[in-house]
Every structure is written in C-alpha cells, then in structure tokens.
Amino acid sequence: MKNILKVFNTMILALIIIIATFSNTANAADSGTLNYEVYKYNTNDTSIANDYFNKPAKYIKKNGKLYVQITVNHSHWITGMSIEGHKERIISKNTAKDERTSEFEVSKLNGKIDGKIDVYIDEKVNGKPFKYDHHYNITYKFNGPSDVAGANAPGKDDKNSASGSDKGSDGATTGQSESNSSNKDKVENPQTNAGTPAYIYAIPVASLALLIAITLFVRKKSKGNVE
C-alpha cells in the first residue's frame, strides 16, 4: 500500500511540473520584445520621427490578437498616433521623462506596417521660437518573430492622406516634411490565426483523467478489489 501511495504522489508531482512547464512555455511564446524602425512613408528611408520612438517595443498576443506597446519620448509633441488605422490606447505615462507608452492592435510582428502620426510644436526649440503642425503617414519596420500569427484585420482610418508642407514659424519650409501620399498601399492579408495550440487545453484534461483513474485504482486496491 505504501508503495502505491509513493507512486501516486510521484505521478501527481510529475503532472503538476508538466502542466506548469507547458503553461510557462505558452505564455513565453505569446509575449516578448521586438526591435523596429520608423521610415518615411512607403520608403526605406529613416524618418525624422524615428528618434522620438524608444526601442525596443513589446508585443503581446491575447485572445488571438496581436498587440504592440510602443513608448515615445517628447510625448507632448506627439498629439496622436495610429497603426493600420487602429488608434493608440495609452497604457502608461511618465510626465517627468515626457514619455508615454501606447498599445496598438497589429496584424503582424515582422515586416512593414503603415501608421500615422500627429505632431504639434509651439515653443522654443534650441532657444528659438518654433511652430510645427503636421499630420503625416509613416511606415513601421518591425523586426519581430514571423511565426507568431494573429487574427487581426487592419482597421479603417478616417484620414488617408497627410497634410501639406511643413512650415516653421517664419513661414519657411522646414525641410523636415515626410513623404505624403493620398493613395493607400494594399495591406498584406494577415495570417489566419490557429489560436492557442490544442495541446495546451488537452494536457489538463488528460491529467485530470489520469488523476481520476489513479484515485479509483488506489481505492480499489485498498479494498482488495483489484485482481
């Protein structure tokens, strides 16, 4: 009887370890960090806005959808952002550092993704009065894992084109304008999401069934009903 109980306890401990290991593996695969760059819209040229984006970003997969969390500095200059038509959801702010972290729903973690940014500056920059008010398209180049798929579909943005020339407070063009376009590029079809692997759900069920079987066996053995 003592030997049976030892085997029973050992198997229970093993099941707990297996379940914990698979759960941690699944969670680890559903979040992480990714490096990225901000390009001028529909080009491979680095945008002037790139320096205002802290790297790396963080990605999360939840409920079958992909999200990236991006932190910007000079936060009060950046009055609005969107990625694939999905507006930012601010999740944290650091007033002292003038930073904020925003979450966006995305269709993939690797490759180019279109976004928009609104910038408004009306203060002294390098000791001189400076005024800058612009809304323009940009392209994010994500360098994250390509094997993490989501079911996300690009959202619809109410503005498809950027505004006119960037101008400083003296009315002269600043030379910092981004490439503007009124035509939307086609967005790649997101990969079909397979959801959480089936074995993640199967393991607890199989473990429970095994636990019940062992319990019944031990009870029968203690009563002398096992042949």
Curated annotation (Swiss-Prot):
Query: What start and end residues bound the annotated signal peptide?
Result: 1-28
Q: Which residues form the NEAT domain?
A: 29-150
Q: Carries keyword Metal-binding? A: yes
Q: What is its main location?
A: secreted
Where are the residues of the annotated region Disordered?
A: 149-191
Give residues where Pentaglycyl murein peptidoglycan amidated threonine occurs.
Answer: 192
Upregulating conditions: Repressed by fur in the presence of iron.
Task: Indicate where this protein resides in the cell.
Answer: Secreted, Cell wall
Residue numbers of motif NPQTN sorting signal? 189-193
A Gene Ontology cellular-component term:
peptidoglycan-based cell wall
Topology in the lipid bilayer: Peptidoglycan-anchor
Q: Which CDD domains has this protein been placed in?
A: NEAT
Q: Quick one: a GO biological-process term for this protein?
A: heme transport
Q: Which InterPro entries match?
A: Haem_uptake_protein_IsdC (IPR019909), IsdA (IPR050436), NEAT_dom (IPR006635), NEAT_dom_sf (IPR037250), Sortase_SrtB_sig_NPQTN (IPR017505)
- One MF annotation (Gene Ontology) recorded for this entry: metal ion binding
Q: Where does heme bind?
A: 47-48, 132, 136
Q: Which residues form the propeptide?
A: 193-227
Pfam families this protein is in?
Answer: NEAT (PF05031)
Q: Where are the compositionally biased (Polar residues) regions?
A: 173-182
- Identify the SUPFAM superfamilies for this entry: NEAT domain-like
> Tell me, what does this protein do in biology?
Involved in heme (porphyrin) scavenging. Binds hemoglobin and almost exclusively free-base protoporphyrin IX. Probably has a role as the central conduit of the isd heme uptake system, i.e. mediates the transfer of the iron-containing nutrient from IsdABH to the membrane translocation system IsdDEF. Hemin-free IsdC (apo-IsdC) acquires hemin from hemin-containing IsdA (holo-IsdA) probably through the activated holo-IsdA-apo-IsdC complex and due to the higher affinity of apo-IsdC for the cofactor. The reaction is reversible.
Q: What is known of its domains?
A: The NEAT domain binds Fe(3+) heme iron. Reduction of the high-spin Fe(3+) heme iron to high-spin Fe(2+) results in loss of the heme from the binding site of the protein due to the absence of a proximal histidine.
What does the subunit section of this Swiss-Prot or TrEMBL entry state? Monomer. Interacts with IsdA.
**The family this protein is said to belong to:** Belongs to the IsdC family.
Protein's name in the database: Iron-regulated surface determinant protein C
**Which source organism does the UniProt entry give?**
Staphylococcus aureus (strain MRSA252)
